[in-house]
Amino acid sequence: MAKKAMIERWKKPKKYKVREYTRCHICGRPRAVYREFGLCRICFRKLALEGKLPGVRKASW
């Protein structure tokens, strides 16, 4: 989990629009974030396996 101060700093509006970047809505991780869900790969996998993301299934081929 991101520290409370980091989350508060992340929520503040940026001075310049180009400085904004995607972060996970749950843990605040800045890397490997899926834009469509707003989640990092770790949180995405956890929620998908729990069945909390509608329409997401584990791939099988």
Swiss-Prot record:
Question: Could you cite one Gene Ontology molecular function of this protein?
Answer: rRNA binding
Q: Does the keyword Ribonucleoprotein apply?
A: yes
Kindly list the GO CC terms recorded for this protein: cytoplasm; small ribosomal subunit
Cited Pfam families: Ribosomal_S14
Required co-factor(s) are: Zn(2+)
Keyword Transport on this protein? no
Which GO biological process entries does UniProt record here?
translation
Listed binding positions for Zn(2+) are: C24, C27, C40, C43
Q: What is this protein called?
A: Small ribosomal subunit protein uS14
What organism is listed for this UniProt entry?
Thermotoga maritima (strain ATCC 43589 / DSM 3109 / JCM 10099 / NBRC 100826 / MSB8)
Point out the gene that encodes the protein: rpsZ
